[in-house]
């Protein structure tokens, strides 16, 4: 669910997810649409595509189990749907961490109407 995603992002990046990524670029957070602005925004685009690939799942509300061991996210024993949701969230948290150097404050609250049509997943 969103709380677990935000928690993973905080653990991996040290950034509070909602204010840092909630309106970032064209693909992070609310109203995501459009060609990614940078590598950070691309992480969110890939995450959105990961969620889209989940059929019969509710990734924004489902609750899965995971742990934080030795600074590593470990998805727990979940049903297949929950396992994949956890893996999607883990991947975006790691991607955001790996691209912290591309984080651009100018994209933190980016006007979505300026976003061009996105690539297909």
From Swiss-Prot:
A Pfam family found in this protein is: Phospholip_A2_1
- Expression tissues: Expressed by the venom gland.
Could you list this entry's UniProt keywords, alphabetically sorted.
Cytolysis, Disulfide bond, Myotoxin, Secreted, Toxin
State the disulfide connectivity.
26-115, 28-44, 43-95, 49-121, 50-88, 57-81, 75-86
What molecular functions are annotated in GO for this chain?
calcium ion binding; calcium-dependent phospholipase A2 activity; phospholipid binding; toxin activity
Q: Which InterPro entries match?
A: PLipase_A2 (IPR001211), PLipase_A2_dom (IPR016090), PLipase_A2_dom_sf (IPR036444), PLipase_A2_His_AS (IPR033113)
PROSITE patterns from the entry?
Answer: PA2_HIS (PS00118)
Q: Which GO terms describe its cellular component?
A: extracellular region
Subcellular location per UniProt equals: Secreted
- List GO BP terms, alphabetically: arachidonate secretion; killing of cells of another organism; lipid catabolic process; negative regulation of T cell proliferation; phospholipid metabolic process
Subunit (UniProt): Homodimer.
Q: What does the UniProt record say this protein does?
A: Snake venom phospholipase A2 homolog that lacks enzymatic activity, but has myotoxic and cytolytic activities.
Record-stated family: Belongs to the phospholipase A2 family. Group II subfamily. K49 sub-subfamily.
Q: Provide the protein name.
A: Basic phospholipase A2 homolog
Which species is this UniProt entry from? Metlapilcoatlus nummifer (Mexican jumping pitviper)
Give the source lineage, highest ranks first: Eukaryota, Metazoa, Chordata, Craniata, Vertebrata
């Amino acid at each position: 669910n969103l709380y677990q995603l935000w928690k993973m992002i905080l653990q991996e990046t040290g950034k509070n997810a909602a204010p840092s990524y909630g309106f970032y670029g064209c693909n992070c957070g609310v109203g995501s649409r459009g060609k990614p602005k940078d590598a950070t925004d691309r992480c969110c685009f890939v995450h959105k595509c990961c969620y889209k690939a989940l059929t019969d799942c509710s990734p924004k509300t489902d609750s899965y189990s995971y742990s934080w061991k030795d600074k590593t996210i470990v998805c727990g024993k979940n049903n297949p749907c929950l396992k994949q949701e956890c893996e999607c969230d883990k991947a975006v948290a790691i991607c955001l961490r790996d691209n912290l150097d591309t984080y651009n404050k100018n994209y933190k609250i980016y006007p979505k109407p300026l976003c061009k049509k996105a690539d297909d997943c």
